[in-house]
Design a protein with these regions (language model features):
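Solvent-exposed, low-complexity segments and loops of surface/extracellular structural proteins
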Residues: 1-259
């Protein structure tokens, strides 16, 4: 795909896909002649990084595919507020590396983006090393599956580290299990709402006062020494006695929590 190709998507939800991407130099979306294309899907060349400059009117959705390579970075800059980025992990035993997302215009006070983390059914733990987002106030994070075959109970999307420096709200949804290994870095984060999530959620909370809600899965919440009287926790309803939520913390101050 080059700047000389002209693609018009017309009506509907249209996707343009490329393979063999080598992100040594950023792919500039403004160089491409795409109209009415909603989604752009990129599969890297084996052992190469993904690097996209999203400064363009279209598309607003990006899909990146991990290509049999461990821990290669993904950088998408100049995103518009409201954009969606999907990270597809398709190979067992390989991880997506550090993912860094940034907006073109960071001046807004209520900017949101959506991040979809999708793993492959039957592959066990599918890992993203780290997600870094700045200049965004609301992160909508979804845990799902690649393709139409859902991840099974023994599978989980895993995000080792997360840094959301300006986010005040993190909304989590999805039917696939999700593990957040290390504490979320977010000094102004006040709300984590996973009440709509049906998969199991394992979360290590940020070291801030939180209003935290989880969904109908068997959720595991870890607070360490950060749980205080000001935290509000609602672990949601569970569909059976076999689906049990758990919370661990070294308690300094404790008020009322709901489980």
């Amino acid at each position: 795909l080059s700047k000389f190709d002209i693609i018009g998507g017309g009506d509907g939800d249209d996707t343009v896909s490329i393979t063999g991407h080598d992100g040594v130099t950023a792919l500039k979306m403004s160089d491409l002649q795409l109209t009415s294309v909603e989604t752009f899907k990129v599969t890297a060349t084996n052992n190469k990084v993904i690097n996209i400059n999203a400064d363009s009117a279209t598309p607003s959705n990006f899909i990146t595919v991990e290509n049999a390579t461990t821990a290669k970075t993904t950088d998408i800059t100049n995103l518009a507020a409201g954009s969606a980025v999907t990270l597809e992990n398709t190979v067992n035993g390989q991880t997506i590396g550090v993912v860094t997302l940034g907006l073109k215009d960071p001046s807004g006070s209520s900017d949101a983006i959506t991040i979809n983390v999708n793993g492959t059914s039957g592959q066990g733990a599918e890992t993203v090393d780290q997600i870094i987002v700045a200049d965004v106030e609301t992160i909508n994070l979804s845990s799902g599956s690649v393709g139409v075959t859902p991840m099974v109970a023994s599978d989980s999307n895993v995000i080792t580290d997360q840094s959301y420096s300006t986010a005040t709200a993190l909304n989590i949804t999805g039917a696939a299990n999700l593990t957040m290994s290390n504490a979320i870095v977010g000094t102004v984060l006040t709300t984590i709402d996973a009440s709509a999530m049906t998969g199991n959620l394992a979360l290590t909370a940020a070291a801030v006062v939180l209003d935290l809600k989880t969904g109908s899965g068997a959720d595991t919440l870890t607070f360490g020494t950060t749980l205080t009287v000001d935290d509000v926790i609602d672990a949601g309803s569970n569909p059976s006695v076999l689906s049990v939520d758990s919370l661990s913390a070294t308690i300094n101050e404790l008020g009322t929590s709901a489980a």
